[in-house]
């Protein structure tokens, strides 16, 4: 929800559901609105439909290749920096504040967080580029706007997800475009 014109309200790093009424003065008039974005249609009152985020997640926000059983996970080394970054990205709660704050209603911060938290660990590597392509394509299909990197999304994110994840996702997306779809490349070309 938007409280007094700010996604999630007046406090940085705090979601609406964690905002206490005691943070407002007695007698204050508070204006509460739903998120406003084409991809988040209003259902009624303060309820908006965020199923577009679910469809983006379903497009590739998972690991489907066999990566070993539970004991095997302990034998796969994950560099500390990657582990920390993956955990930072995994904090995204998919609330939609990034979309609500963006002048273009872009979902890049959400998608970047979901792509990065899987792409930074060894288990996510086999599908890394396929995942980013599928999720960005689904984001575009859902009608979210283009990112112009103004940073308004980062400023209102209750989990303080960094814009750096968008840069990381853009690099992975560029690689996915260069690599192309192996099915389309096979048998073609000038060779």
Annotate the PLM regions.
Residues 32-38, 42-91, 95-191:
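Ferredoxin-type iron-sulfur electron-transfer modules in oxidoreductases and energy-metabolism complexes
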């Amino acid at each position: 929800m938007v409280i007094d014109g700010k996604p999630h309200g007046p406090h940085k790093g705090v979601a609406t559901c964690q905002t206490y009424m005691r943070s407002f003065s007695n007698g204050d008039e508070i204006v509460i609105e739903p998120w406003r974005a084409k991809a988040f249609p209003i259902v009624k009152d303060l309820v908006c439909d965020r199923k577009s985020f679910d469809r983006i997640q379903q497009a590739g926000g998972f690991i489907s290749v066999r990566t070993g059983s539970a004991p095997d996970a302990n034998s796969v080394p994950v560099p500390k920096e990657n582990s920390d970054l993956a955990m930072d990205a995994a904090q995204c709660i998919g609330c939609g504040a990034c979309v609500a704050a963006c002048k273009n209603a872009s979902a890049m911060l959400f998608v970047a967080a979901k792509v990065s938290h899987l792409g930074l660990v060894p288990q996510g590597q086999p599908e890394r580029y396929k995942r980013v392509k599928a999720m960005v394509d689904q984001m575009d299909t859902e009608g979210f706007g283009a990112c112009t990197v103004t940073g308004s999304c980062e400023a209102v994110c209750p989990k303080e997800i960094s814009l750096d994840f968008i840069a990381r996702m853009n690099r992975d997306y560029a690689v996915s475009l260069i690599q192309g779809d192996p099915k389309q490349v096979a048998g073609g070309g000038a060779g």
